Amino acid sequence: MVRLLAARGETLAVAESLTGGLVAAELTGVPGASRVFRGSVTAYATELKRDVLGVDGTLLDRRGAVDPEVARQMAEGVRGVLGADWGIATTGVAGPDPQDGQAVGTVFVAVAGQGAAEDGGQTRPESAAARPDQAVGGPGNTGAPGYALGGPDVNVVALRLNGDRAEIRRESVRSVLKLLLQRLSGERAGNGRAQDTEQNGGN
């Protein structure tokens, strides 16, 4: 991934919530990451998503931090704040308790970048135990995983992860990086649609 970004002359910024810096740690563990990695914002507290990343406060009040539109705005926000070509984001519930009315294992990951969703395919994070489900809803639907998100340059994936807290966080890291890799590799992704996928964490 670092090589792909470097070859394209592009940069990356990361916004994290439930992963708490794990995505940034994974990226910076790769030699040469400094050529492409702009930095990260760990917006663990809900108000930081609003104050630092520019996520709409009314949206956060109405639907909470665990929401596909929040993930989209986090990815777009960190891309702008840190001046990167690409922004990626994670938000969700690692457990042990539900949050904002969402069950443990509910996770949304997002990628924002030029041409991030120009095709009509669907993103299915790879896992030996994955059971991809067709995205539900359509343009204009709101409030549930699977609704189409605004903006032609953002992909959001809704995950239903099984496992303990650590497994859910690890799988969230793997899934957002896979989504970015798919975009960089020119593979088909969800055309701005939140794709709902259930899988076991830790695979």
What do these predicted ranges mean?
Residues 1-203:
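Short alpha-helical segments enriched in small residues
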